[in-house]
Design a protein with these regions (language model features):
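Short, strongly patterned local motifs
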Residues: 1-87
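Alpha-helical transmembrane segments and their immediate juxtamembrane cytosolic regions
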Residues: 90-430
């Protein structure tokens, strides 16, 4: 997307900022005889996507050059960004905003992930419903916010800081906990071959077989997103990116259906990739064509209730088909049930769009912290309650017990999110 820079000379610094249809001086490109880039219209400015993954180098930041008095006024009202000095002594304030309903979607989805990782009865329909469908929200939003940074180098720089390094860090942080848990359960430290199993599992994207096991299972989401980003980057280099992506989504459906029947593919990352690629591409297509932007509370509420109701009915049919041995129908119903759930949640988040809470924004920013560390707290809570209640078997929560436990876990992790924002941005993928 074209950078939205409106430069003005110091001689005109007391004039009001111009609109995108006005010019108050030559740009540096014009002075060098280079054709200036096409200006962005007002509609495009208001229609821009905001990067929820990188707030420092985002192309969705709106950089507007201001005269110095205007900048000082903005600073006095705490509306301006950092005062910077460019080579030609232009003053600007860096203004950036977030899409609030996307923050709500990410925050609710990550809370649902923690809730579903607390062991509960599989006989409770809505637990299975959330357990099966929650992740589609993350994949849709990841596709919706996907953008081209101009070069493979810049893309991989983002992937390195936003996905690869956090994946390695959170696996490394959890490994000492894995050793401590093994020691408590077995009365001693593991042998070398056993101790290396989770290491190999982490290096193989949380794979599990006779030689390795997942170290931090929920992190399968990060390599899956990385692979999807790379697929999109490769398809963009062709003239038929959407045809290729649609073909890959269709193939992923059949491979996922076959795997559900024959179980030939390993779990977690490969299976998650096959299952969620269509939702990622759907989000990407919506983002590229600037769809799903308008907010209308009454319409959004009706759509939310309708989509969730249809999704619940389809998921109940989906489970019935499984129990009656109708494998093909079972798989076919799974995808529309996911679509209904996805848009039901997103429309619900649009209803909440006018409610802006810093807590919700920080949960959205700190999604990686919660995904990467909540398993440690979940298993610790399970272990403590089993011993406190003298249970002879694994604990099984009721929903009204699991919900406050999940909120407590999120509250414990919240300070880590705040510390990461201020001092260790690598923890939140920056």
């Amino acid at each position: 997307m074209t950078d939205i820079f409106q430069k003005r000379s110091l001689g005109n610094r007391f004039k009001q900022p111009t609109t995108d249809h006005e010019e108050t001086g030559q740009s540096e490109q014009e002075e060098r005889g280079i054709e200036p880039q096409e200006r962005v219209t007002q509609a495009e400015m208001t229609d821009m996507r905001i990067d929820h993954e990188d707030h420092r180098e985002s192309t969705h930041r709106i950089n507007i050059f201001y005269p110095l008095p205007s900048h000082i006024h903005c600073k006095s009202t705490k509306k301006a960004g950092t005062l910077c000095r460019l080579r030609r002594k232009y003053y600007f304030c860096n203004m950036k905003e977030r899409i609030n309903w996307i923050d709500w979607g990410k925050a609710l989805a990550v809370c649902s992930v923690v809730f579903c990782h607390l062991p509960q009865s599989q006989e409770w329909f809505y637990y299975r419903y959330l357990q099966a469908l929650t992740m589609v929200v993350f994949f849709f939003i990841s596709g919706y916010l996907k953008k081209d940074r101009g070069s493979d180098k810049e893309n991989w720089k983002k992937y390195w800081h936003g996905l690869i390094i956090p994946y390695l860090i959170y696996n490394a942080v959890v490994y000492p906990y894995w050793l401590a848990k093994y020691y408590m359960l077995n009365g001693g430290l593991p042998q070398l071959t056993t101790a290396l199993k989770p290491v190999f599992g982490a290096l193989l994207f949380e794979h599990e077989n006779a030689f390795c096991e997942p170290l931090n299972g929920p992190l399968w989401y990060l390599p899956a997103i990385l692979i999807m980003h790379v697929i999109i980057d490769l398809c963009r280099k062709t003239k038929h990116q959407h045809r290729i992506m649609i073909t890959l989504c269709i193939i992923s459906f059949f491979v996922y259906a076959a795997n559900k029947y024959w179980y030939f593919a390993p779990n977690l990352t490969p299976m998650g990739l096959m299952r969620n690629l269509p939702y990622y591409y759907l989000g990407y297509a919506f983002g590229q064509y600037h769809l799903y932007r308008a907010v209308n509370p009454m319409r959004d509420m009706i759509c939310c209730v309708s989509c969730l109701a249809v999704s619940i009915l389809l998921f109940a049919w989906h489970l019935h088909a499984f129990y009656t041995g109708q494998h093909l129908l079972h798989i076919v119903l799974f995808y529309p049930a996911n679509i209904g759930f996805l848009f039901g949640v997103l429309y619900g988040c649009k209803v909440l769009d006018s409610i802006k809470l810093s807590f919700v924004t920080n949960l959205s920013i700190g999604t990686l912290v919660i995904i990467g560390l909540h398993v440690v707290l979940v298993t610790t809570a399970n272990f403590a309650l089993e011993h406190l209640l003298h249970l002879n078997s694994c604990i099984c929560y009721q929903w009204y017990e699991a919900l406050p436990t999940a909120l407590l876990i999120i509250a414990i992790l919240y300070p880590i999110i705040m510390v990461g924002k201020r001092h260790f941005p690598v923890l939140i993928g920056r």
